[in-house]
C-alpha cells in the first residue's frame, strides 16, 4: 500500500483554524539592550578604572549614551504593527546597525582623531558624563557594573592629572653630573663637578654615592673635596679681613693668621694637581768647541776683541759654526778677559800695600824709600816698587783695541 499526501479525486483538503490561530497573539517583548554588550561593557569598565586611560573610558561611555538616545528616538518614530512582528524586526536591524557603528567608532584612529579635533570640549563632556555616570548602570550577563567616578578622580580637571602623576612618580635621587659618570676622570675636576651637581656642598655627592669610585679613588676624592672646602673657607676669611686695611694676598700682614702662607702653598699645589705637572724649564743648549775651533777663535781674539759682521761670518765658515755662536763666544771671551784683568790689578795693589806697610809707623827709612817734603808741610813716601806698579797699571789701561769696562757690562752667556 502506497501512502500519498495528495487528496483523492473530487475532494479538497481544508484546514480548520485552531484555537491558537483564532486567538490574537500578544506582541513579542524584545529587550532593547545594545547588541554584543559583553565585549565593550567590560572594556569600558576597565578603561574607566585605569588611571592612564581615563579619557578613553569617557569617550566610550559618551558613545554608548548617544546610541541609547538614538534607540529611544527611533522607537518613538517607528510605528508598531498589530502583532508586533514588524517592529521587532526593525528594532533588531537598528541594533545591528548601532553595533556596527559603535565598532567603527572604537578604532584607535577615530578615538585619537576626535581627541585632537575636540580637545577644547573634552573637559565639559567629561564633567557631564561623570555627573550622569552614577545614574546609568550597564548590565552584562546578569552582572551589574556601576561606573562611578568621583570629582577628585575625574581626569577632566587638570589638577587631578598633575596630582596623580606626582603621586605615581617615584622619588628619585638627584641626577649625577655627566662628567662624573666616568671613573677614569682626573680628580682635579671632582670638586667643580660635585658642586655643580649638588647645591648643598660637594661632600653631598660622596655621601649619596659612597660606592661610586673604588676605594683608593674614593679616599683621594674625599681628600681633594676637603682641600677645596678649606680653600673656600680661607678665601672667605681673607675677604673679610680685607676691609680692615690688610691685603688678602700677603700673609705677612696677618700675624694672627699664620695659615695663610700655607694656604698659598697648598693652592699652588692644588693648581698643579688639577692641571697636571708644571711645565719644564727650557734647557739651554751648550756648544762644545773642538781644539781647532778654539785655536781659530783665540787667534782672532788676539787681533781684535770686537770683530765686525763680515769677520764673524768668515770665521764661522772656517770653524764650521753659526755666526750667532761665534758672536756669543766673543762676548763670553771679553767677559773672561775683563775678569782676568781685574784680578791682576787687585793682586798688584795688594803687593804694593805690603811693600809700603813699614811706612805706616811714622818712621822713615832711607834704605827702603825716599822722602820728599812739599810746601804745605806734608810728607810723601815713595816705595821702591811703585814705579813698576804704575807702569803695569798704565799698560793694563792702555789697550791697543780701545777696550774699557764701560763698553760692555754683560755676564757670561752660553755659546
From Swiss-Prot:
Listed Basic and acidic residues bias regions: 341-353
Keywords recorded for this protein, A-Z: Developmental protein, DNA-binding, Homeobox, Nucleus
Basic residues composition-biased segments: 244-284
Ranges of biased composition (kind: Low complexity): 23-34, 154-170, 354-378
The keyword DNA-binding is assigned to this record: yes
GO biological process: negative regulation of DNA-templated transcription; regulation of transcription by RNA polymerase II
Subcellular locations according to the entry: Nucleus
Matching InterPro entries: Goosecoid-like_HB, HD, Homeobox_CS, Homeodomain-like_sf
Tissue expression as described in the entry: In early embryo development, expression confined to two regions; a horseshoe-like pattern across the dorsal side which is destined to form the brain hemispheres and a second domain which invaginates inside the stomodeum and which, is fated to form the foregut, ring gland and stomatogastric nervous system (SNS).
Biased composition (Polar residues): 122-143
Keyword Nucleus attributed: yes
Bilayer-crossing regions: none
Broad class of where this protein is predominantly found: nucleus
DNA-binding region as annotated in the record: 282-341
Disordered as annotated region, ranges: 1-37, 66-87, 114-171, 238-284, 336-383
CC terms in the record's Gene Ontology section: nucleus
Stored Gene3D superfamilies: Homeodomain-like
Record-level Gene Ontology MF annotations: DNA-binding transcription factor activity, RNA polymerase II-specific; DNA-binding transcription repressor activity, RNA polymerase II-specific; protein heterodimerization activity; protein homodimerization activity; RNA polymerase II transcription regulatory region sequence-specific DNA binding
Source species, domain of life: Eukaryota
Entry's family note: Belongs to the paired homeobox family. Bicoid subfamily.
Known role: Appears to regulate regional development of specific tissues. Can rescue axis polarity in UV-radiated Xenopus embryos.
Protein name, entry field: Homeobox protein goosecoid
Annotated source species: Drosophila melanogaster (Fruit fly)
Lineage: Eukaryota, Metazoa, Ecdysozoa, Arthropoda, Hexapoda
Gene coding for it: Gsc
Amino acid at each position: 500500500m502506497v501512502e500519498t499526501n495528495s487528496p483523492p479525486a473530487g475532494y479538497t483538503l481544508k484546514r480548520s483554524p485552531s484555537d491558537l490561530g483564532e486567538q490574537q497573539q500578544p506582541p513579542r517583548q524584545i529587550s532593547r539592550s545594545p547588541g554584543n554588550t559583553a565585549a565593550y561593557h567590560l572594556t569600558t569598565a576597565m578603561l574607566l578604572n585605569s588611571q592612564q586611560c581615563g579619557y578613553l573610558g569617557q569617550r566610550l561611555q559618551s558613545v554608548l549614551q548617544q546610541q541609547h538616545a538614538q534607540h529611544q528616538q527611533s522607537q518613538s518614530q517607528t510605528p508598531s504593527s498589530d502583532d508586533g512582528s514588524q517592529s521587532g524586526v526593525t528594532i533588531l536591524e537598528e541594533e545591528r546597525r548601532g553595533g556596527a557603528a559603535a565598532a567603527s567608532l572604537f578604532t584607535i584612529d577615530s578615538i585619537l582623531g576626535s581627541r585632537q579635533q575636540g580637545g577644547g570640549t573634552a573637559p565639559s563632556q567629561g564633567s557631564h558624563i561623570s555627573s550622569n555616570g552614577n545614574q546609568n548602570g550597564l548590565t552584562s550577563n546578569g552582572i551589574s557594573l556601576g561606573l562611578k567616578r568621583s570629582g577628585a578622580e575625574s581626569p577632566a580637571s587638570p589638577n587631578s592629572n598633575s596630582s596623580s602623576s606626582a603621586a605615581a612618580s617615584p622619588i628619585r635621587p638627584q641626577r649625577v653630573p655627566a662628567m662624573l659618570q666616568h671613573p677614569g676622570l682626573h680628580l682635579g675636576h671632582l670638586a667643580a663637578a660635585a658642586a655643580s651637581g649638588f647645591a648643598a656642598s660637594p661632600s653631598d655627592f660622596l655621601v649619596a654615592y659612597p660606592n661610586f669610585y673604588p676605594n683608593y679613588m674614593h679616599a683621594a676624592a674625599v681628600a681633594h673635596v676637603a682641600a677645596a672646602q678649606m680653600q673656600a673657607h680661607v678665601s672667605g676669611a681673607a675677604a673679610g679681613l680685607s676691609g680692615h686695611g690688610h691685603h688678602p694676598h700677603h700673609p705677612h700682614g696677618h700675624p694672627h693668621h699664620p695659615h695663610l702662607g700655607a694656604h698659598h702653598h697648598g693652592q699652588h699645589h692644588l693648581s698643579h694637581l688639577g692641571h697636571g705637572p708644571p711645565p719644564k724649564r727650557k734647557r739651554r743648549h751648550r756648544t762644545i768647541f773642538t781644539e781647532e775651533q778654539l785655536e781659530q777663535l783665540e787667534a782672532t781674539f788676539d787681533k781684535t776683541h770686537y770683530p765686525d759682521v763680515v769677520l764673524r761670518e768668515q770665521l764661522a765658515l772656517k770653524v764650521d759654526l753659526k755666526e750667532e755662536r761665534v758672536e756669543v763666544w766673543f762676548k763670553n771671551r771679553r767677559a773672561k778677559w775683563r775678569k782676568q784683568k781685574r784680578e791682576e790689578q787687585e793682586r798688584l795693589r795688594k803687593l804694593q800695600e805690603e811693600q809700603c806697610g813699614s811706612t805706616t809707623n811714622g818712621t822713615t827709612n832711607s834704605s827702603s824709600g825716599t822722602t820728599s817734603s812739599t810746601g804745605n808741610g806734608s810728607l810723601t813716601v815713595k816705595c821702591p816698587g811703585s814705579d813698576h806698579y804704575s807702569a803695569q797699571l798704565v799698560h793694563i789701561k792702555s789697550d791697543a783695541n780701545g777696550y774699557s769696562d764701560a763698553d760692555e757690562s754683560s755676564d757670561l752667556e752660553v755659546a
